[in-house]
Amino acid sequence: MSIRSLGYMGFAVSDVAAWRSFLTQKLGLMEAGTTDNGDLFRIDSRAWRIAVQQGEVDDLAFAGYEVADAAGLAQMADKLKQAGIAVTTGDASLARRRGVTGLITFADPFGLPLEIYYGASEVFEKPFLPGAAVSGFLTGEQGLGHFVRCVPDSDKALAFYTDVLGFQLSDVIDMKMGPDVTVPAYFLHCNERHHTLAIAAFPLPKRIHHFMLEVASLDDVGFAFDRVDADGLITSTLGRHTNDHMVSFYASTPSGVEVEYGWSARTVDRSWVVVRHDSPSMWGHKSVRDKAAARNKA
């Protein structure tokens, strides 16, 4: 038994209202109410996938990974303890806030709070109604999407996420950060999604560079691009990645953490072999981050 998918993410932000507007009106998420877990947002039949809480860090506050059942949770708890990781069993109050049957909490080697859970709440009786025009998000067995973890030591992080949590390497991109600076980015999967997690020693102040949501059609991407571009928040133009072949754009959230919004990523199957790339994109993905940063400051 192992981790099945990325199930949810929680952000601590200084402007909850701005995030609410961005997630719903720009990206098409559905408001799911305000609870002790924060402002909740849906993208499918799950009760929530993203939580936004008041806080000053303007960053990812926690992430939750899903396992199939109680036995899977116990197995992951044992594996973490054997690796010397401090593990806490979530109490009834935390389980209620998260809307799960059971969970454990711990942290990765560089302090990101993580959770593993089973028995998430489904709300099929409440159809998903997007906050803006989008035909749907790709979730199911592939989970919520992915995020890119920024760490000071990628080897240490890679060992933790693969040896302890059980992620598998999909591929590596050597990211050229300057004339004489190359940073390898490692892309990891735990299901058919090409990567649920990426790890890189990017010199950034945030815990993550971006999180990704995958939508059902190219038109979904295009319409969202126009909505986000109207506010000057695009950080990277439309492009197609070399590794997962996703067509996407990047935009700045109100906290400065970026979001990738994409379509048509290829999946990993049993025939997959690890490869490496010298460039992150076949075409496009031209940076316009300076413009977005100026707009956020304004």
UniProtKB/Swiss-Prot annotation:
Fe cation binds at residues 146, 210, 260. InterPro entries: DiOHbiphenyl_dOase, Glyas_Bleomycin-R_OHBP_Dase, Glyas_Fos-R_dOase_dom, VOC, Xdiol_ring_cleave_dOase_1/2. Its cofactor is Fe(2+). Pathway: Xenobiotic degradation; biphenyl degradation; 2-hydroxy-2,4-pentadienoate and benzoate from biphenyl: step 3/4. One of its GO terms (biological process) is xenobiotic catabolic process. It holds the Pfam family Glyoxalase. Optimum pH is 8.0. Residues 5-119, 143-264 form the VOC domain. Binds 1 Fe(2+) ion per subunit. It catalyses: biphenyl-2,3-diol + O2 = 2-hydroxy-6-oxo-6-phenylhexa-2,4-dienoate + H(+). The keyword Hydrolase does not apply. Its EC number is 1.13.11.39. The keyword Oxidoreductase applies. It is an enzyme of class 1 (oxidoreductase). GO terms for molecular function: biphenyl-2,3-diol 1,2-dioxygenase activity; ferrous iron binding. Shows a preference for catechols with groups immediately adjacent to the hydroxyl substituents. Homooctamer. The enzyme is composed of two planar tetramers rotated at 45 degrees relative to each other, with a channel in the middle. Belongs to the extradiol ring-cleavage dioxygenase family. NCBIfam families: 23dbph12diox. This is Biphenyl-2,3-diol 1,2-dioxygenase.
